[in-house]
């Protein structure tokens, strides 16, 4: 940051990429002690984005500012029927790059003159974070 001309004290808050926490709705969340516990002992496994929550907390604590994470990969907004796998006793789980996909879908909806909620889009994440 300093190499780019910024100091941590220049910011009012920090935001890290969310990791594999418990399933939650899409949104912006304050990095809580529970979020820290979840990424330290991830309920759904390791993911590089778990570091985003830890780094945001660390930077926030250093500067005395709030730390947030947004649309983690554990976002679950699937309908009940979408959780049906076709195998008795086995449900489908929701894991996807919510931050990337929701961001581009919001941009596409705006270009179409629609709200995110009314747009009907197919978004494909082809890697790269």
Question: What does each of the following model-derived ranges do?
Answer:
Residues 3, 13, 54-58:
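Generic beta-strand or strand-like secondary-structure segments
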Residues 1-4, 104:
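Short, well-ordered amphipathic alpha-helical segments that serve as non-catalytic structural scaffolds
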């Amino acid at each position: 940051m300093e190499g780019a001309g910024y100091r941590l004290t220049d910011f009012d808050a920090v935001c890290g990429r969310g990791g594999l926490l418990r399933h939650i709705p899409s949104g912006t969340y304050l990095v809580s002690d529970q979020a820290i516990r979840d990424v330290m002992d991830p309920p759904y496994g390791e993911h590089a984005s778990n570091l985003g929550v830890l780094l945001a907390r660390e930077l926030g604590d250093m500067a005395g500012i709030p730390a947030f994470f947004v649309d983690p990969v554990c976002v679950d907004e699937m309908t009940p029927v979408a959780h049906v796998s076709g195998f008795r006793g086995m449900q489908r789980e929701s894991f996807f790059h919510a931050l990337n996909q929701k961001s581009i879908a919001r941009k596409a909806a705006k270009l179409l003159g629609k709200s995110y909620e009314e747009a009907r889009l197919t978004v494909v994440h082809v890697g790269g974070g």
